[in-house]
Amino acid sequence: MTMRSAVFKAAAAPAGGNPEQRLDYERAAALGGPEDEPGAAEAHFLPRHRKLKEPGPPLASSQGGSPAPSPAGCGGKGRGLLLPAGAAPGQQEESWGGSVPLPCPPPATKQAGIGGEPAAAGAGCSPRPKYQAVLPIQTGSLVAAAKEPTPWAGDKGGAASPAATASDPAGPPPLPLPGPPPLAPTATAGTLAASEGRWKSMRKSPLGGGGGSGASSQAACLKQILLLQLDLIEQQQQQLQAKEKEIEELKSERDTLLARIERMERRMQLVKKDNEKERHKLFQGYETEEREETELSEKIKLECQPELSETSQTLPPKPFSCGRSGKGHKRKSPFGSTERKTPVKKLAPEFSKVKTKTPKHSPIKEEPCGSLSETVCKRELRSQETPEKPRSSVDTPPRLSTPQKGPSTHPKEKAFSSEIEDLPYLSTTEMYLCRWHQPPPSPLPLRESSPKKEETVARCLMPSSVAGETSVLAVPSWRDHSVEPLRDPNPSDLLENLDDSVFSKRHAKLELDEKRRKRWDIQRIREQRILQRLQLRMYKKKGIQESEPEVTSFFPEPDDVESLMITPFLPVVAFGRPLPKLTPQNFELPWLDERSRCRLEIQKKQTPHRTCRK
C-alpha cells in the first residue's frame, strides 16, 4: 500500500508548478502520508504485470546547466523516466511499476532535472507527454533524499545530480521482472511493519481493500458456512438414525423368519415320520388281508365240492352259509376299507354254482346262521313284513342270494341270463364302483303311507311280465265340486271411485310400508358388507384362513355298513337307487278307447297342408 500510494501521489502532483513543489509531493508519498488525501481517492490501481518501455536517457544537466535533449527529439508521445535521487551512478535499483497518466503541462513549465531555465518554445520540443513510466523508489533512499537537499534545480552554474551526470555508455541495464516491491535494509521497523500490514490486508481482503466492510462481510460469510455445516451434520445424523432403525427392523424380521423356517422343518420331519409309519402299517394290513382272502377262497372250494354231489332241494345250512357268514361277520371292518382289493371276478363262477343249489323263494330267516346276531334277522323280517311298495327294493337281496335252482350241467352263461331276467331292476356283470342307498330297517316306516280310499282312487290291474303276478297301478280320479251360482249383481256395488286422490290415499300406506321394507333391506345389506370387510381385514392381519365348508354327501358312510352281499350282478344305480327294468311296450292310457284314437288319427289326416296351396 505504501509503494502504490507513493506512485499515485507522485503522479497526481500538479503539473503547472516548479520542480521543488513536485519534489515535496514525492517526499510526502515516500513518507507514507494519510490515505484520505484528495489525490489518493482519485488514483487507480496499476496492473502488476505490465511490460515497461525502455527508459530514456537519465535526466541530467550539463555543467553549464543546459537541458539534455530527449532521444526521440522530444516527441509529443514520448515517455520520460524518473530515477531515484539517491541511486548510485551507473546502477538501477530493482523496482516495479507501470505507466501512470499525467496531465499535460503547459509549455512554459520547467522539466525535472533541468536547470531553472524554461524550455524554449521554438527549440522543437513538444509539450509534456501524456503517459510517464514511474518506478517506485525505495523507502530508505526517499527518506535520505528528503533530509538532504539535492541540487535538482539550482542555478545555471550549479552541480547536477550524480545520477544525471553519470551515464552508462553501454546502454541502460535490463529491467527487473514485475513482483512485490523489495524493502530497503535501512528502513525503520515501524515503516516495515506498516507496509507489510497494508500489503497483507490488501491481499487478504475479499473486496480488494483493507477497510472494515471487507472484514464484516467475511465474518458473515464464515457464519453462514458454519450454519450450513451444522445443518448438514444434523441431517446426516437423522439419516443415520433412520437407517439404523431400518437395519434393526430387518434383523428382527430375519430372526422371526428363520424361527418359522426351523419350526416348519421340524413339522415336516414329524409329518414324514408319521407317513412312513402309516404306510408301514397299511402294507402290513394289506398282506394280512390278502392271506385271509386266499384262505377263504381255499375253504370255499373245499366246501363247494361235497355240495355239488347232493341232489336234495333243501340246502344243508352248515357247510357254506355258516362259513361265509362267519367269516364275513368277523371281517366286516377290513372288508369295507379294502373293497377294491377283493378278487370278485375269480369268485363269481364259484358263487353262481353254489347259488344254483338254493331254492328260489327261500327266505333268509330259514337259514340257520349261528354267527349272525338275532337283531339283524329281526330287522330283515320287519323290512319284509312292511306292506309299503317302495320297500320292495329291500326284498331284492334275498332274491339275489337265492336264485332258481337248476341242474348243475347248465353252462354259466345260461345261469347268468336266467338270473338277470329274474331281477326287477337293471343289472350288469361289469364291475364298477356304485352305492345302493337303502334305508336301514326299522320297526316304523320312514314315510307314513297316506290313507288310500277306493272311492277316490281307481285301480287298474296290469299283468306283470317279471314275476307273473298282478300289480296294482294307482291312478288319481277326477273329483266334482259343486259350485253355487252367484246372486244378481247390485249396480251400486260394482261402481268404484277411481279418482287420483282416492287411489293415492288407498295406496299411500302400502307404498310407505314398501319403502320402509326396502330401506330396512338396504341397511341390512350394508351391514353385512361392512361385516364382511371387517372380517377380511381381521383375517389378513392375523393370517387366519377362512374355514372351507365341509363337503357332505347323501350317501351313507362306510362305517354304517350292517350287512354284506357278494354277487356277480351289480345294479345300475342312479342317484342311489337302482333303475327299474322296463319291457318295451307301446304307451297306452287306460281311459282312452280305440274309437277316440281313431278319431284323432282321422282328424290329423284330413287337415290340409298350407304349403300345398299356390
From Swiss-Prot:
Its main location: nucleus. GO terms for biological process: chromatin remodeling; positive regulation of DNA-templated transcription. Component of a multisubunit histone acetyltransferase complex (MSL) at least composed of the KAT8/MOF/MYST1, MSL1/hampin, MSL2 and MSL3. Forms a MSL heterotetrameric core with MSL2. Interacts (via PEHE domain) with KAT8 (via HAT domain) and MSL3 (via MRG domain); both interactions are direct. Directly interacts with NUPR1. Interacts with TP53BP1; this interaction may be required for MSL1 DNA repair activity, but not for histone acetyltransferase activity. Interacts with TTC4, ECM2 and PIHD1. Induction: Up-regulated by gamma-irradiation. The modification Phosphoserine is found at residues 66, 126, 205, 393, 442. Residues 496-514 are annotated as: Interaction with KAT8 HAT domain. The coiled coil is formed by helices from two subunits in the MSL1 homodimer. Belongs to the msl-1 family. InterPro entries: Msl-1 (IPR026711), MSL1_dimer (IPR031840), PEHE_dom (IPR029332). Residues 472-591 form the PEHE domain. Gene3D superfamilies: 1.20.5.170, 6.10.250.2000. Non-catalytic component of the MSL histone acetyltransferase complex, a multiprotein complex that mediates the majority of histone H4 acetylation at 'Lys-16' (H4K16ac), an epigenetic mark that prevents chromatin compaction. The MSL complex is required for chromosome stability and genome integrity by maintaining homeostatic levels of H4K16ac. The MSL complex is also involved in gene dosage by promoting up-regulation of genes expressed by the X chromosome. X up-regulation is required to compensate for autosomal biallelic expression. This is Male-specific lethal 1 homolog. The modification N6-acetyllysine is found at residue 353. One of its GO terms (molecular function) is protein-macromolecule adaptor activity. Residues 170-184 have a biased composition (Pro residues). PROSITE patterns: PEHE (PS52052). There is a cross-link at residues 301, 365, 378 (Glycyl lysine isopeptide (Lys-Gly) (interchain with G-Cter in SUMO2)). The lineage of its organism: Eukaryota, Metazoa, Chordata, Craniata, Vertebrata. Residues 158-169, 185-194 have a biased composition (Low complexity). Residues 1-127, 147-217, 272-420 are annotated as: Disordered. Residues 393-407 have a biased composition (Polar residues). A motif (Bipartite nuclear localization signal) lies at residues 505-519. It is found in: Nucleus; Nucleus, Nucleoplasm; Nucleus speckle. It comes from the Eukaryota. Sumoylated with SUMO1. Residues 272-281, 294-304, 376-392 have a biased composition (Basic and acidic residues).
